[in-house]
């Protein structure tokens, strides 16, 4: 899936070079220049802008993307430059909040747009082969989308209007709250 695609794309788009620092943690190589995504909210991490030093704040949020600008092995830290121009420093122990984002799932892409998208359908579980997933994937692209799959897969998705039921317990919580 996306994990394996990220490994392949990292080697193609950001291959090892003598001038790029890198390190391994949890069977993953992190390299200067790698595309990364914040995968959970961190309300406390400090950020700043180099072009406007007095502008600083706290908080990097789920779905924000950027690239590894510097790796500081002795300090066991990395500096990330986010796409909006903010810099944040992460200790190696905080890297569970980040993952590579050369390839991401449709779910993680929601709320984002990209100039170009490639939608790979091979190996997609049947429960995710729905019209709304296909629509969401296609509408992430601003300029061009390429769908890699068979006509049958695309037709199945386009015709499959089944909705995945979600059992959140929200109705029960609201009813309990109303009874209180």
Placement of each model-derived feature along the sequence:
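Conserved helicase/translocase motor-coupling segment
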Residues: 1-62
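C-terminal accessory regions
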Residues: 49-51, 55-58, 62-180
């Amino acid at each position: 899936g996306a994990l394996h695609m990220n490994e392949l794309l990292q080697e193609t788009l950001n291959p090892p070079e003598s001038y790029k620092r890198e390190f391994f943690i949890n069977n993953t190589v992190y390299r200067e220049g790698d595309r990364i995504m914040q995968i959970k909210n961190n309300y406390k991490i400090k950020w700043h802008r180099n072009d406007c030093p007095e502008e600083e704040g706290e908080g990097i949020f789920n779905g924000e993307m950027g690239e590894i600008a510097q790796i500081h092995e002795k300090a066991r830290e990395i500096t990330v430059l986010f796409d909006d121009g903010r810099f944040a420093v992460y200790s190696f122990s905080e890297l569970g909040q980040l993952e590579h984002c050369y390839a991401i799932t449709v779910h993680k892409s929601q709320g984002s747009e990209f100039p170009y998208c490639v939608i790979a359908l091979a190996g997609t579980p049947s429960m995710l082969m729905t019209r709304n997933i296909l629509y969401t994937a296609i509408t992430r692209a601003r300029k061009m989308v390429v769908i890699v799959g068979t006509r049958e897969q695309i037709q199945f998705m386009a015709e499959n209007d089944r909705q995945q039921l979600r059992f959140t317990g929200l109705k029960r919580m609201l009813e309990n709250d109303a009874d209180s």
